[in-house]
Amino acid sequence: MAASTMALSSPAFAGKAVNLSPAASEVLGSGRVTMRKTVAKPKGPSGSPWYGSDRVKYLGPFSGESPSYLTGEFPGDYGWDTAGLSADPETFARNRELEVIHSRWAMLGALGCVFPELLARNGVKFGEAVWFKAGSQIFSDGGLDYLGNPSLVHAQSILAIWATQVILMGAVEGYRVAGNGPLGEAEDLLYPGGSFDPLGLATDPEAFAELKVKELKNGRLAMFSMFGFFVQAIVTGKGPIENLADHLADPVNNNAWAFATNFVPGK
């Protein structure tokens, strides 16, 4: 007997393809046929190399078998989870949220570390442009002028700055977690859309799915960049742009290996 496929129009199954096929033993036995249903799993964007079982893997064709729980449903899934951090669905959902949020902060932070130095090197009077030195200006006699302009924000108390940061960032994070704030409600806490997408970049589902991947790829790079900026600040005492300029001027003596050897015992 030929297997049959049908779509149920009941509201409970609306939009889901259901495969109804008899088991072989049932056909060959008494001739009685029992129908089995198989609900198709949701797939990623059609033709996208970043989603689904055939997506790009972390080592390309040498990646091996991916864990069963990494199905390529979510952006940034390259099938790599050696430590099993994503095995638990709740932990996986939480880690996805943390990664996206930290990626966005890292991208903003990396821009904030680099941009003032670029402006200062191109003749813009910026006060202290190096990111880790700028904040310490608040301990000077004159305090800290935002953007080097005393008419904007003239900060003189580190406690006042700390309290302001806690209040403002606490409010923003509270709105994000609750999914409700001055800009309205959000159905998706990670990708709220609406007022947060004034250019309508997420209107097309295919383009939106690809933008999610691009955001995570750039965010992961930004997190590594911020870590590198921290290490540079400790080791060289200079900002990222100045370190880059020194390396380009003398790559032999200004590189990670040369600075690492300075910490060899007895040197």
UniProtKB/Swiss-Prot annotation:
Binding site for chlorophyll a 3: 137, 147, 215
Free-text remark on how the cofactor is bound: Binds at least 14 chlorophylls (8 Chl-a and 6 Chl-b) and carotenoids such as lutein and neoxanthin.
Binding of chlorophyll a 5, residues: 214, 232
Binding site residues for chlorophyll a 4: 218
Cited InterPro entries: Chloro_AB-bd_pln, Chloroa_b-bind
Record carries keyword Transmembrane helix: yes
Motif extent (Required for interaction with CAO/cpSRP43): 197-200
GO BP term (any one): response to fructose
Binding site for chlorophyll a 1: 80, 86, 99, 220
GO cellular-component term (any): apoplast
Binding site for chlorophyll b 3: 157, 173
Annotated membrane topology: Multi-pass membrane protein
Subcellular location: Plastid, Chloroplast thylakoid membrane
UniProt KW keywords: Acetylation, Chlorophyll, Chloroplast, Chromophore, Magnesium, Membrane, Metal-binding, Phosphoprotein, Photosynthesis, Photosystem I, Photosystem II, Plastid, Thylakoid, Transit peptide, Transmembrane, Transmembrane helix
Annotated binding of chlorophyll b 2, by residue: 104, 153, 183
Interaction with LTD: annotated segments: 221-224
Residues involved in chlorophyll b 4 binding: 165, 176
Known role: The light-harvesting complex (LHC) functions as a light receptor, it captures and delivers excitation energy to photosystems with which it is closely associated.
PANTHER family: CHLOROPHYLL A/B BINDING PROTEIN
Subunit structure: The LHC complex consists of chlorophyll a-b binding proteins. Interacts (via T14 domain) with LTD. Interacts with CAO/cpSRP43 during its post-translational targeting to the thylakoid.
Protein name listed in UniProt: Chlorophyll a-b binding protein 2, chloroplastic
Taxonomic source organism: Arabidopsis thaliana
Upper lineage: Eukaryota, Viridiplantae, Streptophyta, Embryophyta, Tracheophyta
Gene expressing this chain: LHCB1.1
